[in-house]
Amino acid sequence: MTNIIQQLEAEQAAKIEAKRTLPEFSPGDTLRVNVRVTEGNRTRVQAYEGVCIARSGGGLSESFTVRKISYGEGVERVFPIYSPLVEGVEIVRRGKVRRAKLYYLRDRRGKAARIVENTGTRARKLNESERQAAAEEKARLEAEKVAAAQALAAEKAAAEAAEAKAAEEAAKAAEATAE
């Protein structure tokens, strides 16, 4: 009875992760976050690319902050990890930093705000595993498309065969009435 909230949060997190999984990322990484945006009655997916400057919270309320420079102005956006509006996250490059919160980047401009790319073995492994997972997902989607196209072609062929059979029967009936 004591951990009912934790149990409910774990169930909700598992339910959301069944639909989509986010890659393992940390502050300093340059991310491309695909966000679902609703404008009037239209919905589209918009990419928001910037540097992850913080991850905070835990459980269902965990979130991450992404900072980018747009037309010379710094723009920060906080995304909840388990938000249904976050379609997916792609890691553009991994950064090498010594802090968990990179709020000092707010005061820096241009080259001073650069983050060194992490080329260590762990970063390489993570990048390779992400690429492999993306390739597997792409192959799975392609296989689904091919299967759907084949099913559609088979359905079309069956419909044409039934139509030809009906036309043949109609011709026989017309021939029988003509005699």
From Swiss-Prot:
Gene Ontology biological process terms in this record: translation
GO MF annotation list: structural constituent of ribosome
One Pfam short name: Ribosomal_L19
Keyword Transit peptide in annotation: no
Gene3D superfamilies: 2.30.30.790
Name of the protein in question: Large ribosomal subunit protein bL19
Function description: This protein is located at the 30S-50S ribosomal subunit interface and may play a role in the structure and function of the aminoacyl-tRNA binding site.
Domain of life assignment: Bacteria
Cellular component terms (Gene Ontology): cytosolic large ribosomal subunit
PROSITE patterns xrefs: RIBOSOMAL_L19
UniProtKB keywords: Ribonucleoprotein, Ribosomal protein
Family the entry assigns: Belongs to the bacterial ribosomal protein bL19 family.
